[in-house]
Amino acid sequence: YLFFSLLTFFAGSISNFALAPWDNIFVLVLSFPIFFLVLKDIHNDKKIKYKTLSFIFFGNIFLFGYFLLGLLWISSAFDYKEGFAELKLISILGLPFLLCLITSPGWILTAFLWGKGLRGCFALSAGIITGEFLRSHLLSGFPWNLFGHSIGFNDFSMQIGSIFGFHLSGFFVILFALAPVLFLKKNTFIWGITFSLILPIFMLYGYLRLPSEIRYLDKDFLIIQSKISQDKKLNSNEIENIAKKFLELSKTDNKVDLVIWPENAIPIFLSENENIRRMLMLGIENSKNLLVGDLIIKNETDIYNSAVLISEDGRITATYDKVHLVPFGEYLPLSKY
C-alpha cells in the first residue's frame, strides 16, 4: 500500500503539468495510466465496502497530490507579513484536504461502475468529473484546476469548450489520456485507437471553427504592470509614490484607446474617491479611458474585487465584479469564527 500510495501521489502531482503555465496535456498520458493500473490492482476485493474505501483512499491521494502542487501558490498570500505561519500551513494542506472531501462521492461512483478495461476507463473518467462538478458548485464553488482546463494549451483545442464546456471536455480528455491502457489487450485495442483520436478531433473542430484570418479592431491598448512590493502597498505613506509610478509608466508619445492597470494598482478605494480618480485621469494624457482593478464596498459587509472603467472626467462608467475570490488570498474562510 505504501508503494501504491507514493506512486498515486506522484501521478497526481505531475498531472499539474497539463495546466498553465506548462500546458503539456500529454503528461496525462503518463499519469492517468499509472493511476488506472493502481486502481486495477486493488479492485479485486470482492467486498464492495472495502473496495469502495480503497477507491476513496487512493483517489484522494491522487487528487491530494494534484491539489497540493497545483494550489501551492495560494499560500504566498501569507508571506507579506509575519505572524501568519499557522494559516499558511492550513492553506497548503487544508485546502487540498477539503477539496478531496468534497470530491469523494466521485470515487464512490467509480467503485460502483468499475470493471475491466474499457468499463474501468469510463468509470474513472465519470468519477473524476463528478467530483469536479461537485467542487465547482458546493459551498462557494471552486472550479479551479479542472482537467478540462488542459484543452487550453492551444487555440484550436480549446474551441471544443464551446460545445461541451469544461466538465464534459475533461471527461473526454481523461479518456484520451487512458488510451495507452487499452492498447495492452487485443480486445480493447480498437478502443485505444478511438480514444487516441479524441484530441486530434478536438483540434480539427477548432481549426474549422476559427476564421483563417483574424480581423483586429483598430484599437490601441496600453497595459501596465509595475513591480511594487506588497509592503509598500500596505504603507499609506507610499500611495502618492505608487500613483506617480503608474502615471509615469503610462506616458507614451501616441494616443491609445485604453490604459489598463493591474488589480489593486493604487491601494485605496478608487470607487470612493472621485477627486483622486479625476487627478489620475488628468495625469493620463494619452487616453480617455482607464481600466483598473479596485475594491468596491457595496454595503457594510460585502467588499467586491472588481474591474472598473474610468472615463476622462473621473466617472466610473462600468464595473465587473470577480465571481470567485481566492481563499486565503482574497478572503479568509470561516473568518466569523
What kind of region is each of these model predictions?
Residues Y1-L210:
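Membrane-embedded alpha-helical bundles of multi-pass enzymes
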Residues G206-L332:
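Soluble catalytic regions of membrane-associated enzymes that act on cell-envelope
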Residues L334-Y337:
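Short, intrinsically disordered, charge-balanced linker/junction segments flanking boundaries
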